[in-house]
Regions:
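Alpha-helical transmembrane segments of multi-pass inner-membrane proteins
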Residues: 136-164, 184-250
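N-terminal signal-anchor transmembrane segment
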Residues: 2-72, 94-99, 407-409, 425
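A membrane-periplasm/extracellular boundary helix in multi-pass inner-membrane enzymes
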Residues: 148, 154-157, 251-308, 329-332
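Long extracytoplasmic/lumenal interhelical loops at the membrane interface
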Residues: 38-39, 43-45, 176, 300-367
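Hydrophobic, aromatic-rich transmembrane alpha-helices
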Residues: 12-15, 19, 58-73, 199-208, ...
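Aromatic-anchored transmembrane helix interface
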Residues: 84-93, 103-127, 138, 143
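Hydrophobic transmembrane alpha-helices and their immediate junctions
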Residues: 207, 211-212, 216, 244-258, ...
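Transmembrane alpha-helices of multi-pass inner-membrane enzymes
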Residues: 61, 199, 245, 396-410, ...
Length: 453
């Protein structure tokens, strides 16, 4: 009896210790996810010229916590070793490393290194701590808060997140055609558009049925749509419409019918409201957004009727058309990029190019062809893997696929603007889906082998 009591006491102590470790890890994981998703990049400290943002600080805390416990550390590095992204990330990081050395620019390496470390911390958190269901619940709550703030921001023409600004000079307030463009926790209205279109498909996932349903979160769907309008981003609105259409097409018959009826009623009420308040700033903004997209597609000038600065929009389109010509500039080294800290300017066809509103062109400038090719291969690999594994969890994988593809499609019209972490979050979720599927397959194989034996 004495031996049994001693053994029980030891088991109990071990359990309590693990419980405290797990509780601490859980709390840190939730804080990390909140900071990662919603806390702006301009909140932090400047240490010896390096911006220690809240996200980077939480990354350090999480990383040191993980490596402090052998079992947690082993699981974390095991995730990295078996990652589907690792070979491509290694090649890309090698390019950033030699560019850092040759251009004497440590940010060239550190910027990408931090982003990928955060992605793998997310993979670990989702897989071993929060789980996919709880992670999606937290993301939906954060997106809801973000969208409510967006409405308040439009009314007061000031982002509440700006009260957190401790790293000055990073916010770019935008006014287009007399209308304020909301930017949420981002530093630019276009960046906020990227966040919304990459996150939107996640709110349409029905985890129970493993399917997509546009009406899974009706209120949040309408809030996201409203916020996209208020960003003033034509490309984000156009891509959002495409996302909505694909989600409807890929919904099951019952949800498709309900969605079409709901959207018909919603659009009818919206049209009546917009026309009823035709002369208000909001109605003009909505009409201008649609007219701008129509003008871009068909070469018309309907947007001018709703206060658009047509000349400015035309110059913006012409400017973007010139950007791919940067690939032909002989003075740029095709093997060694300029790094991330150097200012770029060039004169092409008489235009002075200073702002690179194309992520892929910007990647070429930063990392030359080796870096651009390595990064594009990472994207292609991810896209192919997602397409091949849709059947694992149709709703969630398609949501990751739509968010991933929409995000990078939009980057043909702008740079990433410090929003890559949102698409890396989708990649982290997809990685966990594959890990869980492989684990299930291995379990079934073991059971099958035992049965045969």
């Amino acid at each position: 009896m004495e031996q049994v009591r001693t053994y029980t006491a030891k088991r109990k102590s071990s359990y309590i210790k693990n419980s405290y470790e797990n509780k601490g890890l859980y709390v840190l994981s939730v804080i990390f996810l909140v900071v990662y998703y919603i806390v702006p990049q301009y909140f932090g400290l400047s240490v010896a010229g390096f911006d220690l943002t809240a996200q980077r600080l939480m990354m350090l805390i999480m990383f040191f916590y993980i490596i402090s416990f052998n079992d947690i550390k082993n699981r974390f590095f095991d995730i990295i070793r078996h990652s589907i992204y690792l070979p491509y990330i290694i090649v890309f990081m090698c390019v950033t490393m030699y560019t850092m050395v040759l251009r004497v620019d440590i940010n060239t390496f550190m910027q990408s290194a931090i982003e990928f470390i955060c992605m793998y911390i997310l993979v670990y958190i989702i897989k071993d701590v929060l789980g996919i269901k709880r992670t999606l619940q937290i993301i939906k709550v954060l997106l809801f808060i973000m969208c409510l703030q967006g409405i308040v921001e439009y009314v007061i023409q000031f982002s509440l997140f700006q009260y957190l600004e401790t790293l000055p000079g990073k916010i770019n307030i935008q006014i287009r055609s007399g209308s304020y463009r909301i930017m949420g926790p981002c530093n630019h209205a276009l960046a906020y558009g990227l966040v919304l279109i990459s996150s939107f498909p996640l709110i349409c996932v029905d985890l129970e049925k493993k399917a997509l349903n546009l009406l899974q979160n009706k209120i949040l769907f309408m809030l996201v749509m409203l916020n996209i309008f208020l960003t003033g981003s034509r490309s984000a609105l156009a891509i959002f419409i495409i996302e909505v259409l694909f989600i409807i097409i890929l919904s099951d018959r019952e949800n498709k019918k309900k969605t079409i009826i709901f959207l018909f009623c919603f659009l009818l009420i919206s049209v009546i409201a917009v026309l009823g308040f035709y002369n208000t700033s909001f109605s003009q903004t909505v009409l201008r957004q649609f007219a701008s997209i129509f003008d871009e597609l068909f070469g018309t000038q309907w947007a001018v009727k709703f206060g658009a600065e047509v000349e400015r929009l035309s110059q913006s389109s012409s400017y973007r058309e010139l950007l791919p010509k940067i690939f032909k500039q002989s003075w740029l080294n095709p093997l060694i990029g300029r790094g991330v800290s150097r200012h770029f300017s060039a004169v092409i066809d008489g235009y002075t190019i200073m702002s690179i509103d194309n992520f892929f062109v910007a990647q070429y400038i930063r990392y030359a062809y080796p870096g651009l090719i390595a990064y594009v291969l990472l994207l292609i690999n991810t896209l192919v893997k997602m397409l091949k594994n849709v059947k694992i969890n149709k709703g969630l994988v398609l949501a990751c696929l739509f968010g991933f593809f929409s995000y990078y499609m939009n980057l043909w019209f702008m740079d990433a603007l410090q929003t890559l972490k949102y698409v890396y979050m989708l990649m982290a979720i997809f990685e966990v889906i594959l890990i869980e599927n492989n684990k299930t397959a291995d379990t079934k194989q073991i059971k099958k082998s035992k049965y045969i034996k």
